[in-house]
């Protein structure tokens, strides 16, 4: 499936984006482990998160769909999961497989895990190493560093204090999930803060979680209690709508009910630094469900100034960098992105892909080992470009096509179903017509 994108001069209106992918995964997994029933509203019904639903069902958890994005999960409770009767296929979802390995590290049975071609190339050693220290057996390709993997957990994992080599919410979360059944407190220390959705949600499910400082988290083992979870809109999906609203000449775009957890709002900080016209209005009342704040975000075009994105900002916007790169090409000055080598092991090598595909559209991107430099003041030229099967690349290239000279074709665009299945409908509604058409 390809996207054919024609340039537009106007975007106007309000929209919502689908539920947060990170929070949806965690709601399903914690609901599966909890005692009692968990009701999840706003669950992201995209391919990645549906893989997590299928995975917990294969582990013996009863899941009932009550309506669009509304799921009832009858938790198995401690020791209640069962050995799956078949291989668990995680598709393209790195979050599913890495967090699931953490869950399985505390289960005394074998589970076989695999994924699609892209996921089988992605690194798993960073998760396997600490869980092996906790007592799990993890074997597979590349000495347990690539899927397919076989995981055998233990009923009582060993408590550990672990220093992660990189700031990674997935590694941290896997250790914490294994730690729920551990023989003592589990501590994770990171070199920089990463997203804290797991900690927030664990508390909502009744776990005792301590944060002595921004880089350290300690979990005390114990059972979870089922609860209600309201999933906010995904800021990583909203990023593409916001960038479109900042680029299109006559635009005024509002995105409602977006999750604005401070560990995820790096993009908003960068937009302020670039002098974007951005408004933020907090969602009324206390945070809902799992305790995640929401806001309404509004944008309209204005001259932008280049900035530097590096250091502690990177974990707070790692998934938004493809959208940010498109925006940076139009700013005044050169935008520098550093300390982002993690981009090379996402669904694609996003550093190389951005340099190559934006280059095809006439935009120069200087590739660096851990990031890129993007000179501003450039114009996009319509072209035939490749997503590489990467959902965020497909959406970034489509947004660039909205302001390109001539039509743009984005190849292999079905991958947007991974995180933002309503992407085309949302942008077409704001454009008041078919800015993006789907070619099958």
Please place each PLM-identified region on the residue numbering.
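Structural preference for solvent-exposed beta-strand-turn elements
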Residues: 1-440
